[in-house]
């Protein structure tokens, strides 16, 4: 058994045959080039049905880590919720119906807040439309939408189109109004930057921010100032000079994001009695607050689509075998190598340790520091490998994804080169210790930095990703192409641990010499 066996996830590092505007191709990557030439490698599918998403839907970090850790294709929340809308179950969901009943009993209004996007990473606009239709059917007095604009998982200036589509759907349904508009930068932080969340809160609750006559005027004003979707300043829709729909006592709120990590902070701010992130007076006492999926197991809030438990995932199987495992990443991807990798469970398994390296807070966006905390992650990992404590290690390097999201090619190239340097350092140490290294990615991003219009490409891609098996005892091994679900079975095979029946992925190892 190789010790340690290190799974290195290069977040956002995809394979694009077109080298133009491709940070992965442009960057100098001597370590990855050498390892690819010397060791068995293969291309992996990370999008669509291969990871439990709808056909053609790009993968993302949450989905990728869930599939890798589970060793099976995990039916994603997006697919699950969309299917329930199609078959009608959505409209009889007891948690959603209870929320609306409570709002009606309190004489309140219903607020729907979340990412207005069809990017499918954090939310889907069709889920919002279904909620508006459900509220109409249930006879709710008023529905107000708090639209967080995307620009990361969608083109950076696509928000105007999504708002126009929302207004058209509201017109078709004959119900609902847009109350506030803001970029996701404010409402969907995940790194305790409470000053951002405070701006979102103050807009939704207090009506602070620019007052605009309608949603189109709000986005047009932002574009005129050169500010694209992600960073749109919080604006209040006030057609007659006073805000249409501020959140107040007796109202209900449904957060329609299905991905948890960027929905937690705004949810805490709106619901937690002990919240101390900023002064939020007034704090509305709501009739109901519903999370579309489980954002945090400790939140005492109703969940419309609770998690489906996953048995015998990689971390659990490794733990039961009596092996020690380490999860290590910087803040931006720490939840992915822990919570998501463990099937949506926060608690570590016995024998599982975790190291969190803080992401840089001194910059507003990571194009200003493309190396992020990757060198510090590497230093901490090498120290740990030298100590010889762990049997299995999962490490994530966030750079290709987080800097790729900025749409700035030069910065993404520097990010790629930083990660390559870290790969080289880790590979040398692991091999020196007699260990093995699986290098892969959860989805693509930095390999496409310009979109078809010639503008910045800030979203994930549907491209395949590499997988390299760096193991001196298996240089002659043959690998087959696969999906992320096949990585855990491959690792168990290398560790000599039987694969449990719940893991339906297949080992990538075809034959060894």
Swiss-Prot record:
Reactions it catalyzes: (2R)-2-phosphoglycerate = (2R)-3-phosphoglycerate
GO terms of molecular function: manganese ion binding; phosphoglycerate mutase activity
EC numbers: 5.4.2.12
InterPro entries cross-referenced by the UniProt entry: Alkaline_phosphatase_core_sf, BPG-indep_PGM_N, Metalloenzyme, PGAM_B_sf, Pgm_bpd_ind
GO biological process, one term: glucose catabolic process
Signal peptide: none
Cross-referenced Pfam families: iPGM_N (PF06415), Metalloenzyme (PF01676)
Co-factor(s): Mn(2+)
UniProtKB keywords: Glycolysis, Isomerase, Manganese, Metal-binding
Top EC group: isomerase
Binding site for Mn(2+) 2: 11, 61, 442-443
GO cellular component: cytosol
Annotated positions binding substrate: 122, 152-153, 184, 190, 259-262, 333
Pathway the protein acts in: Carbohydrate degradation; glycolysis; pyruvate from D-glyceraldehyde 3-phosphate: step 3/5
Cofactor info, note text: Binds 2 manganese ions per subunit.
Binding site for Mn(2+) 1: 401, 405, 460
Active site: 61
Subunit record text: Monomer.
Family in the record: Belongs to the BPG-independent phosphoglycerate mutase family.
General function of this protein: Catalyzes the interconversion of 2-phosphoglycerate and 3-phosphoglycerate.
Protein known as: 2,3-bisphosphoglycerate-independent phosphoglycerate mutase
Species of the source: Geobacter sulfurreducens (strain ATCC 51573 / DSM 12127 / PCA)
Lineage, uppermost ranks: Bacteria, Pseudomonadati, Thermodesulfobacteriota, Desulfuromonadia, Geobacterales
Primary gene name: gpmI
